[in-house]
């Protein structure tokens, strides 16, 4: 069944706004697991704007599920990933001026660098995914780079005006088929929330959705565990309905 990766970055964002010790991302990770999260996702950015090195090191040994560490392809970040050895690393693009990740990794234009990073992480026993736009050329390049997992950037779908998401959903569907054709595990994420997650979760073959901001926001009103449970329930229900409708 489809898996939910709960991204805890914005728990850390709330903490860093006042440079306090709360809310604690460690507790967020553990309580998300209790509520049904299948993995915990966190992005250690070069500017350390939310998740800190100490968070990564504290969370890693405590998880009962999996850690999915998002990071840029830099010597520093690859060193940290190889030292921490999470079960999964998702390589992402990064710009210091962006509010959040703005697009997918440019794999086709930096094939050698991506291939080297993937090989190094694989040698450390880490499964590697590449966060890419739902573009056939990028998926083919990801396969050439040796990646066994891709995460499709759902931002264009999530940001489409009401009633106009259909073409973006078709694009994601085609990208999913291409990834599966290459024998890859295909995940997805970015901008997904309670009102738009169902059509993505219904795509048979999507293994995992990584969602954070929407869950953190809903937790303000409903509490953390309920926000996680409700997102997971929406995903599972959408997938089950899609399978029954075949």
Curated annotation (Swiss-Prot):
It comes from Bordetella petrii (strain ATCC BAA-461 / DSM 12804 / CCUG 43448). 3-amino-2-oxopropyl phosphate binds at residues 7, 18, 191, 212-213. One of its GO terms (biological process) is pyridoxine biosynthetic process. Keywords: Cytoplasm, Pyridoxine biosynthesis, Transferase. GO terms for cellular component: cytosol. Belongs to the PNP synthase family. InterPro entries: Aldolase_TIM, PyrdxlP_synth_PdxJ, Pyridoxine-5'_phos_synth. Its EC number is 2.6.99.2. SUPFAM superfamilies: Pyridoxine 5'-phosphate synthase (SSF63892). This is Pyridoxine 5'-phosphate synthase. The active site is at 43 (proton acceptor), 70 (proton acceptor), 190 (proton donor). It catalyses: 3-amino-2-oxopropyl phosphate + 1-deoxy-D-xylulose 5-phosphate = pyridoxine 5'-phosphate + phosphate + 2 H2O + H(+). Pfam families: PdxJ (PF03740).
């Amino acid at each position: 069944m489809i898996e939910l990766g709960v991204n805890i970055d914005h728990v850390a964002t709330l903490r860093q706004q006042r440079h306090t010790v709360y809310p604690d991302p460690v507790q967020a990770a553990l309580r998300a697991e209790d509520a049904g999260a299948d993995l915990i996702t966190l992005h250690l950015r070069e500017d350390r704007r939310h998740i800190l090195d100490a968070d990564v090191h504290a969370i890693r040994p405590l998880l009962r599920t999996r850690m999915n560490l998002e990071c840029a392809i830099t010597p520093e970040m690859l060193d940290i990933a190889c030292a921490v050895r999470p079960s999964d690393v998702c390589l992402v693009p990064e710009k210091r001026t962006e509010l959040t990740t703005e697009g997918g990794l440019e794999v086709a234009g930096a094939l050698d660098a991506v291939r080297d990073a993937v090989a190094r992480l694989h040698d450390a026993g880490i499964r590697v995914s590449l966060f890419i736009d739902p573009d056939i050329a990028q998926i083919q390049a990801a396969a050439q780079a040796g990646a066994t997992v891709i995460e499709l950037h759902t931002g264009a779908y999530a940001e489409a005006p009401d009633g106009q998401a259909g073409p973006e959903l078709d694009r994601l569907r085609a990208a999913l088929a291409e990834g599966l054709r290459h024998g890859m595990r295909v995940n997805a994420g970015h901008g997904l929330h309670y009102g738009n997650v169902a059509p993505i979760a219904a795509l048979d073959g999507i293994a995992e959705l990584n969602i954070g901001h929407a869950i953190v926001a809903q937790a303000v009103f409903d509490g953390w565990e309920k926000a996680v449970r409700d997102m997971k329930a929406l995903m599972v229900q959408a997938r089950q309905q899609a399978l029954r409708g075949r």
